[in-house]
């Protein structure tokens, strides 16, 4: 018995949106529901459940080189990978992360939901991500990153709500 994979509606739509920057593997577009001014969505052009399932060295290089040279201010990066809640566009999972202008130099305690693993950079953080299960990854591009494994119980909009709350401090 053969099964036919349905088209990824997220990718089918987002690749036709105006791209801030892109290459053959990744793209960055303006988030359609921005948390703050300058909120972008970083996505994989391959249909994968998380950025950690991509070539993470390429993802890190893209963000640090191509994206960082395109914007005028430092940015922070957030991803909740392999999250079943990430089901916009009729239940299709898609690998993506959120990029927002840096709002805090010390991001270590931003998400106090479990054991936080501290990393020197984004690429090291992705190497820590386990091959199964949801994770929360965040940090300032060019700075330290943090990972929490097994975050299946976190509320759906944890990243958005936390960033929004930080903007009002």
Where on the chain are the PLM-derived regions?
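HIT superfamily nucleotide-processing domains
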Residues: 1-169
């Amino acid at each position: 018995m053969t099964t036919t994979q349905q088209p990824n509606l997220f990718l089918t739509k987002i690749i036709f949106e105006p791209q801030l920057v892109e290459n053959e593997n990744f793209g960055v577009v303006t988030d359609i529901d921005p948390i703050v001014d300058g909120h972008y969505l970083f996505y994989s052009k391959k249909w994968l459940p998380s950025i950690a399932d991509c070539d993470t060295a390429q993802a890190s290089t893209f963000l640090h080189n191509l994206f960082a040279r395109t914007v005028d201010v430092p940015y922070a990066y957030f991803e909740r990978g392999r999250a079943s809640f990430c089901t916009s566009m009729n239940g299709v999972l898609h690998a993506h992360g959120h990029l927002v202008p840096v709002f805090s130099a010390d991001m270590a305690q931003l998400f106090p939901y479990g054991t936080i693993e501290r990393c020197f950079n984004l690429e090291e953080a992705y190497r820590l991500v386990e091959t199964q299960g949801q994770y929360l990854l965040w940090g300032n591009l060019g700075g330290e990153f943090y990972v929490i494994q097994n975050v299946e119980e976190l509320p759906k909009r944890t990243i958005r709500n936390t960033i929004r709350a930080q903007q009002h401090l």
